[in-house]
Amino acid sequence: MINIKDISKSSNQSEEKSLKGTSSKTKYPFAAKSLFKGSNNITPYYLSTSNTFQCVASESIQTWLLSDDGHIFTSSGNFVLDVSSGGYFVELVQLNSNSKTQIWTIDTTNNKIQNQGNGKYLDIDNLKICVAPLNGNATQKWTTFRRAPIPTGNWGYFQSKQLDSNNNYWGLSVLNNSKSYNTSVVMNKVQAKSIGQIWQMTNDGHILSRLDGNLVLDIGPSINGSKTNYYLDTNVYKANDLKQQWGINENNQIFNQYYPNLCIGFVGELGVDSTVNCVLAQPSSASDINFQWITNPTYSLNEIVSEVPEPFPAYTSGDLLASYQYISNIATNGHTDDIRSLYTSINVSLEIFYVNVTNATCPSSIHSTEDFSNVQNQIKNELTYAITVRLVFENYSGFYSKLFSQGSTNLTNLANLINVDMSSDQVVNGDYTDAITSVFYAIISEIPIGGSIIANIGESAVEFGELYAESNDSGPSTYQVTLSKLYDHLNENYENEMTNAQSMKNTILQDWGMMSKTFALCFLPTKNPSSLNINGLDFQKISTIASLAYQTAMIQMLLPTNYQIYFTPAGYYAPVSSDDYSYTDSTGTYIMAEIDNCNSYPPKALTDKLWNNGVSKQEVFTSSYGWNLATSVTYYNMVDKYSGMFKLSFPTVKNFTSVPMQFVMTNGSDRVGTFNVKTHFAGLASTYYYSGALGHHYYDIAVTDIDGNKVANFTVDNNLEALEGSYVSIKTGSLVVQPGYVVGNPTCNQGSFSQGFAASILIPIYKSN
């Protein structure tokens, strides 16, 4: 049995269309919203796979895939809608191609969804989905619309559609970029390098701030005691707190899950004051621009390529067909009588075709000059659109090629700086998608106005490749690669992304609707987040930013092979002589040094590539966001402070997901401790624990998300050796990973008794696709 949910996060939703495919493999994403308004006659409901009724922002549970033969799949493609054996309730089951009750007809004219097995119509019974004979009730009326695969989990801005008097965009901002909880969220002019303006929407509807791992958007205090008007602030991420969960509706309003009729807006006039208060209130109307938002980037191409195909005007007979074939021959100098087949060809000049079409005159063999003129004008329009679309992708390909043109040389130079043997079989965590996503993040954070154009194309190409891949499963091989194969791995993925971009371009060029919509985006003002207008873009600046970001991503992959972090708790001596390789906060001092020698530090030429290019020290030394250095606990000159503790392994769990985690560490029946792990941060098991005798000691670790759902279980094997410190690893056969997650290659570093530092192990956990 499945249920319906309140309105959820959606992308910019297009007008309703007849949802029909063209091949047995084609599946188009769509959403179905009930015209039934519920008990309050306000809240809209969506067809959903979830078994609760609260509104959520997870697009995946309310996105369906319609095949051309009438099957309605879940967004993962694993299950289809079917009528239960009782013939009343609707359920999710495995595909059975012989079952007619799994086939549905969507009637967009009459707003009905009919089951072909029993002829009944999709209906609602106490918020449960069922089928019933046609009855005329609103519960049987559904409006369907295209839903683009806009990804959650990427960083960007939430910008108001309302511009100030100088046509500047303003966006949601944490006041003064403060990491403190209960800080006001306000409106500020969108500007570069303002991390407090950058957010990420998670699958469950939390809106994370880039300022800190567990910092999320929350409802603030009431305005003058009102129950319908609130300020906004930040708070710590809480599980199942609907006041912290949000969605985006078809009016581009950001609504709250606890108060689904209240949306985020602002009071005041943008541009008059440097800061304008954000509020949670009820919009005056669906078109109240003070309550409408644009995400930046918008991933505008995602929506376009997920549209139902709209073919070119068909010319199948008479003078229309004759005109099309004649014009095609004239344009291509006799190469073909089907000019549209060449729109995707890289070996032809569409500009020359356009000139030839323009100069063509109607031959005497074609009697209708009107038909000839109509075809001629249509082909001229198509060529104009195709030329523009191709130019956009050619510029993107040029940018992308330049980014990777020195890939081998750059990787070699970095390896030499880090003192890494690139011919070795040492395994590193090298996820290409994370690397390229970090490049797009760097571009939009440095150039928020205009930089989104590159991200709109690039991120859409990434999503396009994943959407149309034969499998969406992401296994350990995605993240694990030997140093000797790292360049080949990166180069192969680079070529795949180039192919994805080309495939997306060709998909657009073969569809009149997609080509028309893409052409329109090419003439939006560059500052518009949906724009593909490359005129005036500073490609040199963009390329420089991208190159530095990609270099940083390579350092993130290579650094853990030779360096780790040595952490000395506050109050104890730490031999710091340079800020180049150290960082201190209230918890203690972090020093970056070689794995085998805590007194051998990275060269200045390497640290300059980090600190001189704006890399955050706090993120590097605490293994936050893209950094994943194992951490060892160290007490200099105090080896006997805690008997045997330096022979311990100190596990670090790195959370690469947007959901907080925790892990429990036990030793037999002894519970060592529970350790929290922020989103995109690392959690260090820092409890002091007596190691015991020499030999193998096993520490069981159970990782769960903030809701208590299992993520992974494994056992750390800590092998104590006399005078040698300890050797640490994941016990063979102990790793169990839940569906939806991937555990990357653990970084295992030996401890040293003589130098007074513990063994370290970092276990990275990723969300799989």
UniProtKB/Swiss-Prot annotation:
Keywords: Cytoplasm, Lectin, Membrane, Repeat
GO BP of this protein: response to cation stress
Region: Disordered, residue numbers: 1-21
Gene3D superfamilies to which the protein is assigned, alphabetical: 2.80.10.50
Induction (record text): Induced by high levels of extracellular Ca(2+).
Subcellular compartments: Cytoplasm; Membrane
Membrane topology, from the record: Peripheral membrane protein
Ranges for domain Ricin B-type lectin: 25-145, 116-249
Protein's UniProt keywords contain Transmembrane helix: no
Its biological purpose: May play an important role in stabilizing and/or regulating the cell membrane during Ca(2+) stress or certain stages of development.
Protein name: Calcium up-regulated protein F
Gene for this chain: cupF
